């Protein structure tokens, strides 16, 4: 459980878990800045991240990065992603589920949620604002992907929803 504010820079990792059935609870604000910097990283199947705190990602960093099948991310806080190669939530694996309930702002070439795998679902119920060339709200690369957009989506400036 991460309760306080965390700042991760210069290629560092805030929380890293290797193994199946891992859960990370982030209740405090997480700031990730810089290439190869990661807020929370899980390597294993059935990984789960509960992001109740705010997530601020820039400079090519990754907020949440899970490698493994059947991963789940519940994002309830405010997510801000700025700059090319910056990704708020990335999952590499099949049967991933991402629930974005908080407000998300994606700008300057950043990506809010990226899932690389088959049978993935992204449930977007919070407000999402995407602004700027090459900025992307939600991207699924794989077969049988499903994006459910129940929240407001505002796309401008050459961005992609």
Where are each of the predicted segments found?
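Beta-strand-rich solenoid/repeat architectures in extracellular/passenger domains
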Residues: 1-11, 21-23, 28-36, 49-60, ...
